[in-house]
């Protein structure tokens, strides 16, 4: 599934945030605004779909996530995801969403109050067909291709219809139901990547070597080279484009003794292996290869992120979030870095966050969602008007400022005229 957009409302300080995804999408705002809350809101929304009924109840009562801003108190959580998917050789646009009432005190009962699923052929003139329609009083689904969305289905107050329908193998949109229940999101917010390069004989259960959330990078690279050598060579090539002095990457396996899993309890969350892996880098300026852990912080993080992106297709990840990708990266390197990331993407999309003015200069304006407060403490994000992109650049040049510096000066000024540039009404 190729994710196209998400809508989040009633999560921490987020109010009706609609993010439309390009290959790369950037959330740009001042510090302590709510950029990370958007990423957490997406993670929460997709995790809620896959969670058990008991876990859903706990999630609906998480007091750390319930809006406490005075203008948002009592607001329900809403989540919608829009995706493109191919079925029988045709591409369909799918909209799936749900809404629930937070459990704000012990006497309240958490409850899903709305849920819907609709699809259409992704062609001009096509209309959506309703497949799921659920309110607080009833839940219905479309049981046949020729029927209406009127078949009743019994669900628990904290159970989603899209979960219940996983057992309905005979419905004609069963594949879409399966895909919605298995969408994956990966958040990369490790500003210090050093721990990912250390030799480690411990493997967490349930996480394979080729999964995007595996933590032992040398082991991942060893498996990538062994099973997907073309992807391994691609990784080496793009990394060398960013760091031309790197001539080669070398990963070695070392056998060790003492990996006795029989002594571990059955419920231990990890297993021990009899091998460790070390990643080396051959630099044209050095007499011999060095352990990758000796590379700079920026070089280590860039390599880790490129690896995760290449793994995204094997891990069926729809969206990768990267916080502050410019961290420890020189501005000129960042421009090439973003270009390479864009080229590596298949069906996966990237969303990044930043509070750095210079990053704006290296991004396409259409990628950027600008965060602003129309109400104190409430986070909203808006894209540029088509005319606003050019106007912002011209106005910045008049003040002899970069576009990023000028944009952030406006964000810091309570008397700004951002509605001249953004798709919003500041006074609304």
Show which residues each predicted segment covers:
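Conserved P-loop NTP-binding catalytic core
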Residues: 40-110
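Switch/communication elements of ASCE P-loop NTPase nucleotide-binding domains
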Residues: 1-51, 271-428
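Extended helical coiled-coil dimerization/tether regions that scaffold
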Residues: 215-292, 402, 411-412, 416, ...
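Electropositive, glycine-dotted interaction segments
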Residues: 91-247
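Short, solvent-exposed loop/turn segments that connect beta-strands within catalytic domains
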Residues: 87-92, 105-109, 258-263, 270-273, ...
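Short glycine-/polar-rich loops that comprise or flank the Walker A/P-loop
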Residues: 77, 181-182, 364-367
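Short acidic, glycine-rich loop/turn motifs
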Residues: 10, 81-89, 119-121, 281-285
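Short, low-complexity Ser/Thr-rich regulatory SLiMs
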Residues: 100-104, 253, 372-373
């Amino acid at each position: 599934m190729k994710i196209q957009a998400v809508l989040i409302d009633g999560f921490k300080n987020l109010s009706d945030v609609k993010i439309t995804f390009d290959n790369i999408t950037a959330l740009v705002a001042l510090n302590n605004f709510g950029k990370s809350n958007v990423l957490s809101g997406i993670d929460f929304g997709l995790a809620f779909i896959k969670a058990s009924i008991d876990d859903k109840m706990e999630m609906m009562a998480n007091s750390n996530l319930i809006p406490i801003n005075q203008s948002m108190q009592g607001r329900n959580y809403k989540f919608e995801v829009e995706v493109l998917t191919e079925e029988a050789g045709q591409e369909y646009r799918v909209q799936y969403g749900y809404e629930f009432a937070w459990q704000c005190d012990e006497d309240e009962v958490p409850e899903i109050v709305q849920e819907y699923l609709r699809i259409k052929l992704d062609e001009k003139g096509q209309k959506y067909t309703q497949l799921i329609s659920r309110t607080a009083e009833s839940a219905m689904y479309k049981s046949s291709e020729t029927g209406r969305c009127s078949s009743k289905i019994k669900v628990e107050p904290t159970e989603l219809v899209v979960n219940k329908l996983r057992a309905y193998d005979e419905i004609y949109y069963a594949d879409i139901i399966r895909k919605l229940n298995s969408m994956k999101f990966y958040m990369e917010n490790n500003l210090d990547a050093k721990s990912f390069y250390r030799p480690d004989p411990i493997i967490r259960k349930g996480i394979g070597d080729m999964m995007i959330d595996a933590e032992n990078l040398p082991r991942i690279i060893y498996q990538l080279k062994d099973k997907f050598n073309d992807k391994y060579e691609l990784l080496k090539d793009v990394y060398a484009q960013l760091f031309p002095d790197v001539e080669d990457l070398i990963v070695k396996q070392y056998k060790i003794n003492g990996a006795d899993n029989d002594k571990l309890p059955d419920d231990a969350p990890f297993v021990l292996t009899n091998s460790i892996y070390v990643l080396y880098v051959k630099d044209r300026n050095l007499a011999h290869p060095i352990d990758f852990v000796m590379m700079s912080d920026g070089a280590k993080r860039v390599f880790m992120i490129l690896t995760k992106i290449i793994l995204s297709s094997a891990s069926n990840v729809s969206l990768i979030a990267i916080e502050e990708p410019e961290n420890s990266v020189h501005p000129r390197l960042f421009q090439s870095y973003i270009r390479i990331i864009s080229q590596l993407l298949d069906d996966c999309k990237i969303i990044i966050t930043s509070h750095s003015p210079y990053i704006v200069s290296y991004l396409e304006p259409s990628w950027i969602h600008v965060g602003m407060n129309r109400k104190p403490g409430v986070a909203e994000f808006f894209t540029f008007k088509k005319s606003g992109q050019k106007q912002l650049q011209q106005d910045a040049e008049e003040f002899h400022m970069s576009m990023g510096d000028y944009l952030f000066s406006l964000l810091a000024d309570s008397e700004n005229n951002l509605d001249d540039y953004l798709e919003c009404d500041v006074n609304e």
